[in-house]
Every structure is written in C-alpha cells, then in structure tokens.
Design a protein with these regions (language model features):
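Glycine- and aromatic-enriched membrane alpha-helices
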Residues: 54-509
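Cytosolic juxtamembrane amphipathic/interface segments immediately preceding
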Residues: 9-24, 253-266
Length: 509
C-alpha cells in the first residue's frame, strides 16, 4: 500500500511540471486528430463504396449441383494421382524381380510407354473407349474435340475423367511388359505399346465400359466390371502372355520339368517394395472408380473389401509357399496379395466382407497354380504378370457371380454400372450373374489373345521384337541404352565383376 502511495505522489509531483503537461496534451491531441481522420475516411468514402457495390452486385445463388460436381471432380483427380503413382510400384516390382542388367531398360520402357499412352489416349483412345458409336467402338470425340465439359451423367469434369482413365490405360500398358522382360527389343516395345493403348485396350474396353458397349447392355443381366479386373488386368495379362509366347524364354532359362527352375531375382527388397506401392495405389484404383466423393458408404465398403482381399490373398500365398517348400517365400507372398487386389477389383462394390475374404483366398491360390502352369508349359514370365493379372482377373470377374451380396447399389450419378443391385449364386441370385460374367470374361480373353498374337507376330516380322543373342547376353541396359543401374559393376554376359579403385597404401610406402 505504501508503494502505491509513493508512486501516486511522484505522478502528482511530475504533473505540476508544465513541460510534462504540454507533452501529454500534444500526445492526446495527435491521437484525436488521427482518429478523426480515420473515421472520416470510413464514413465518407469506404463505407458508401462498399454498400454501393453490394447493392449493385447481388449475391449469386449457390448451385448445389455445381458444388457436388466440384467435390466429385476433386475426388476423381486425387484417385487419378494415386493410380498414376502405381507406375513407381510397377517399375520397382519388375526391376527387383528381374536381373540387374535389365533394370535401366525396365525404367526407360515404363517411361516411354506412359508417354505413348498419353498421346494415343488423347488423340483417339479415349474416343474409341468412352464415347458413343456402336456396341464395339466409340466414334466421336477424337482429340477430345466437341465433347461437353463433364463426362456423361457423372458431373465430373471431362478432363479430370480423362486423367483418371489415362492412368488406367497406362496401368494396362505397363502390365503387358511384365512377362517380356529381359529379351524384348526397345523399338519392338514402342511398336506394340502403340497397338495396346491405341487399339486393343480402348476398343475391347469399350465393350464393357462404353456408354453403348454390347457387354454392358446385353440382356436383362449385363456384364459388370466395377474397376477393371477384366478391362484392365485381364486384357493386360493376356497381352503379356501373347508377348511371352511370341518371344520365347530368355537364354539360359531352364524349366523345372527339364531339371531347372526360375532365374533368381536380383533384388527382392526392391521388388517387394514395389508391390507395396502398388497396394497403396489401389486405394485410388478401386475407391476412385465410384467417381463420387459423396458415395461415402460405397467408398468405405470398396476400401475395406480391397484391404481384406489383399490380406487374405497374401496370407494364403505365404502359408501355401511354406506347405510346399518349408520356406516363407517373399516373392510368392508379394504376388499373392497382388493377385488378391486384382481379383477384388471387379466385385469390390457389390460384395460384403465375407465375400471379399474368400475372393482374396481364391486369388492367393490361383496365382500359385498359375505360376506352376506356366512353368510346366515352358512359358517364361519373370515376374508372374500372367498369373497375377490374367488369371487373377478372370477369377475376380467370375467371383462377382458367386459372392455379390444383393444389397448394394448407388442410384447416384456415378454411372449405370453401380446403379443396379447385383446378386450372386451364393446369395440366392441364381446363375444369371455368373453366366453374364463368364460370357464377358471369356469373350474379352479370347478376343484380346487373338488381337495380341497378331500384334506381337506383326512386330516380330519387323525384326524388332527380340534383341539379338549377343545383346541379350550383354544385358539390355548396356546393349539398348549404354548405361547401367549399378555403375560400380561391369555387367558382361551372365557375370558381374565389381570395379575397384586402387588406393595407395601409406604404410607400405
């Protein structure tokens, strides 16, 4: 209390000083003048201008559908970016499971195929696949000319939908190279890539996904493929099989029935990491195919089913590998969960968790059986592209006719494919859906194989499909590209010699 009294006494004493009173007065006067100027500006200029602008420009009414379309477009683009990111997974998977002397070749082919896909899918591929024409091919919208701002009834911006579907086409193109690693010429790869992304994929894909595709509109029970077990993976896997047949096996590849076995992968860590990146990208592949961020129930169900099928497939392949060899096989487990992802891609919207679990188990089994079948038939598939994508895709397509739960449908602007409830055999739906799925899968498989064999042997006739024996023994990295992914090694034939730099021994000197 005494301290407060002393401070008050000092203030009273200072206030008696006329110089201090003058300074305080000037300070308050300046503050008052500044405040009056600000108030004048606000009341005489800023406020009337703002009120006048508001009265002259009425607030536009919010269009609810415009907001919905914007949200759905953003969701589709996010999914597209995830799917495109799968290219990283593909090149790592292929490079890791192949030999080291082919790693640069795999990456260059992956980049070149992506660029070819982008150009061809813009010029005519998208028109062939997604625009109206007839039941077999689209005939409008070449180079995206004359098309509306949004695609169909989805409300998604057309260019965003194109980016999403370009990523799908690029996935199919990348799958095709998997069984051809190690002996396919680079020029031959470029030639058949044009045929795949420019013709085979979009034309046959139109049958299932085009607005008037004959598979999508056949009979009272149509063929269904939600995110591409058939359209993307079966087509890609079948083309890969045709390429492996046309090329023949790699030099030095001896099959089990002849006393040999698969050539070892050069880096299983890279390969398995690539597989996990692919799994991550699948969360754009399947959930993004709803094309609707507001279909929250569908997105959640698709994401869950995708996860569960991959897990059950991976466990199945892992356990099966141990039963057969008493070893826990990393490569087989990786291909196992990938086959589960491929299989669930078609039915993921229409099945419940129980169905997804068993579809994944089926995927884990068929991929092992498929690898054994190729080995017996002496077909060289270095990474298992055919069992994972072709056989896994066929199984997933048929599984819809067995496990569709009969209670999921989305009467929203997400396309006719998910607007109808689908019921499988095991849920009381009879054989109708299974028949439709069998017809669609069989037709696509046979048509793709015929077209792919014609394409591969056509490219082979040019002399560019397979490299020379000398080039294959040298390694595609050096032979085709003049570089190596591992510059500290000299790759020559089947041997690798590490290069060392001599270092002066100070102690010996």
């Amino acid at each position: 209390m005494s301290r407060i009294q002393s401070v008050g006494a000092r203030l009273r004493a200072n206030w008696k000083n006329p110089e201090i009173r003058r300074h305080v007065g000037l300070l308050f006067l300046g503050k008052a003048i500044g405040l009056s100027i600000v108030l004048t500006l606000i009341t005489r200029w800023f406020l009337p201008a703002m009120l006048g602008a508001q009265s002259a420009t009425p607030t536009p009414a919010l269009d609810p559908m415009a907001a919905v379309n914007a949200i759905n477009t953003a969701w589709t683009l996010v999914a597209a970016f995830l799917v495109f990111g799968m290219q990283v997974g593909f090149v790592l998977l292929e490079a890791g499971f192949a030999r080291s002397r082919e790693s640069v070749n795999i990456l260059v082919e992956g980049i070149a195929d992506t660029c070819i896909c982008g150009v061809t899918f813009w010029l005519w591929g998208f028109a062939f696949m997604f625009e109206p024409g007839n039941g077999f091919i689209g005939l409008h919208g070449f180079a995206l000319q004359g098309l509306p701002a949004t695609y169909g009834t989805t409300g998604v911006a057309l260019l965003a939908f194109w980016v999403f579907q370009f990523a799908f086409a690029d996935t199919c193109s990348t799958i095709t190279s998997g069984a051809m690693i190690g002996r396919c010429g680079f020029v031959g790869d470029l030639l058949y890539s044009v045929g795949v992304t420019g013709f085979i994929y979009p034309i046959i894909g139109h049958w299932a996904w085009g607005p008037d595709g004959w598979l999508a509109t056949m009979g009272p029970i149509a063929f269904h493929d939600f995110a591409g077990s058939t359209v993307v993976h079966t087509i890609g896997g079948v083309i890969s099989l045709a390429g492996a047949i046309a090329l023949g096996p790699r030099l030095g590849r001896v099959f089990k029935r002849d006393g040999g076995g698969p050539m070892p992968a050069h880096d299983l860590i890279i390969g398995a990491a690539g597989g996990l990146i692919l799994w991550f990208g699948w969360y754009g592949f399947n959930p993004g195919s709803t094309l609707s961020a507001l279909d929250t129930g569908g997105i959640g169900r698709v994401s869950f089913n995708t996860t569960l099928a991959a897990c059950s497939a991976g466990l199945t392949a892992l356990i099966y590998s141990y039963i057969r060899t008493k070893k826990w096989d990393l490569a087989l487990t990786t291909n196992g969960f990938l086959a589960g992802l491929v299989a669930i891609t078609c039915p993921c919207y229409w099945v419940d968790p129980v169905g997804a679990f068993f579809i994944g188990i089926g995927g884990g089994l068929v991929v092992v059986w498929g690898i054994d079948a190729l080995e017996y038939l002496r077909i060289d598939d270095p990474i298992g592209a055919v069992p994972v994508h072709m056989i896994g895709g066929i199984w997933g397509t048929l599984s819809l006719g067995l496990f569709a739960a009969g209670k999921y449908g989305a009467p929203t602007p997400t396309g006719a494919d998910v607007s109808t409830v689908v019921t499988g055999l095991f849920y009381g739906g009879g054989l109708g859906t299974l028949k439709a799925q069998f017809i669609g899968s069989a037709v696509v498989t046979v048509a793709t194989f015929a077209a792919a064999m014609a394409l591969m042997y056509g490219v082979k006739a040019t002399g560019t499909l397979r490299v020379t024996a000398e080039g294959e023994l040298e390694g595609l990295d050096l032979h085709e590209h003049g570089s190596s992914a591992y510059p500290e090694y000299m790759i020559s034939g089947s041997e690798s010699v590490i290069l060392t730099i001599p270092v002066k021994d100070d102690a010996a000197a």
